[in-house]
């Protein structure tokens, strides 16, 4: 099926919107900034098992839910799938304000690609799950957002998605990634509920979230919820010659970096910045968050090191009640030149440094870095 659009913005109301396994829907739009808002008014969720192609941007709104099956292939300049209402007036006024209490979920098991240099992918609902592939690798301006809440605002500047604002709500919000989210040096935002009121929000990552780049510096990854559990990988590495690591923020009340967790913001010419539980400025432009409890389990890895040259980066792990360090934390200087970085492990309450913990701020051809320990009560179960 071909949908031909001649205007920059168009609204299509559907009784149902589904794409079968062998079907393809083509949106033929004037340019990459043209947008089609597809609003489903019927009582059933949208099931996308086939292909959607667009040279512009595609928005699917269905309060009953939007599911992309394992065979789904979506390729557009930008993609939004949501169960929240998006009014015609806001759409025409270029205001991306999504709100409402739709009970449906947004689930991706297929492949969604944003191919434009300023392209983005946004999955917005009370419950968002990615079990497939979300890819936006055209430019460092790309952003992928998986956000759960009752009112969500996407903030743009010069047609680029710059951040997300989630208003306070009381719903049980869940965002989960089980497969792959990939931006090439861009930004990934994974948030459940507002940073102002983190209650009832859960983020779980057992997959791989990548904001690394082979050409540019590492990008930015934000995980924000009341309860954040990472058993997978968060990677914002600068892999190319002369590049530096990016920034990774894990913000919430209760944070667990499980034994299989790997968080890395390494760079060829300098380490990046990793904040776990510490007061960090996150991408949703909301107040800084400090965790109550942070646990870094045995064999978990947190690294902001320089690889070849340059200084190690900064790793900050902080809580107000208890911080437990049992894993491996590194902010090493480059192998050829550069100094070690800074690791700060702290708590207003209790800081536990377990027997399996390792903290590395070494420099082969420079000065060693600094490991700062700050706590109301310090418990050390290892040789220092």
Stretch-by-stretch model annotation:
Residues 1-384:
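Extracellular and secretory-pathway beta-repeat/beta-biased strand scaffolds
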């Amino acid at each position: 099926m071909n949908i031909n659009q001649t205007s920059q913005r168009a609204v299509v109301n559907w009784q149902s919107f589904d794409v079968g396994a062998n079907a393809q829907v083509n949106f033929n739009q004037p340019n990459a900034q043209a947008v089609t808002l597809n609003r489903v008014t019927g009582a059933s969720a949208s099931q996308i098992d086939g292909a959607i192609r667009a040279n512009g941007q595609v928005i699917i709104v269905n309060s009953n839910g939007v599911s992309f099956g394992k065979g789904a292939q979506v390729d557009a300049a930008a993609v939004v799938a949501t169960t929240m209402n998006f009014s015609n007036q806001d759409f025409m006024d270029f205001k991306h304000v999504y709100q409402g209490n739709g009970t449906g979920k947004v689930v991706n098991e297929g492949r969604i690609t944003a191919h434009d240099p300023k392209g983005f992918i946004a999955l917005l609902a009370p419950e968002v799950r990615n079990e497939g592939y979300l890819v936006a690798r055209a430019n460092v301006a790309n952003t992928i957002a998986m956000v759960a809440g009752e009112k969500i605002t996407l903030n743009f500047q010069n047609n680029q998605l710059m951040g997300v604002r989630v208003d306070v709500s009381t719903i049980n919000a869940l965002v989960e990634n089980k497969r792959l989210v990939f931006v090439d040096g861009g930004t990934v935002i994974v948030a459940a509920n507002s940073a102002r009121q983190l209650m009832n929000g859960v983020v779980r990552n057992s997959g791989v979230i990548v904001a690394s780049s082979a050409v540019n510096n590492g990008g930015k990854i934000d995980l924000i919820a009341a309860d954040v559990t990472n058993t997978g990988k968060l990677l914002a590495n600068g892999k190319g010659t002369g590049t530096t690591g990016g920034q990774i923020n894990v913000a919430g009340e209760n944070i667990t970096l499980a034994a299989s967790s790997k968080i890395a913001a390494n760079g060829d010419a300098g380490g990046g910045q990793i904040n776990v539980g510490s007061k960090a400025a996150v991408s949703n432009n909301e107040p800084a968050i400090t965790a109550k409890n942070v646990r870094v389990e045995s064999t978990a890895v947190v690294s902001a090191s320089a690889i070849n040259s340059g200084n190690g980066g900064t790793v900050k792990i902080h809580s107000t009640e208890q911080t437990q360090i049992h894993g491996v934390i590194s902010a090493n200087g480059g192998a050829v030149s550069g100094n070690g970085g800074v690791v700060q492990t702290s708590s207003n309450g209790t800081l536990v440094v377990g027997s399996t913990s390792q903290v590395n701020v070494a420099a082969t051809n420079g000065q060693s870095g600094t490991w700062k320990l700050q706590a109301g009560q310090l418990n050390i179960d290892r040789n220092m």
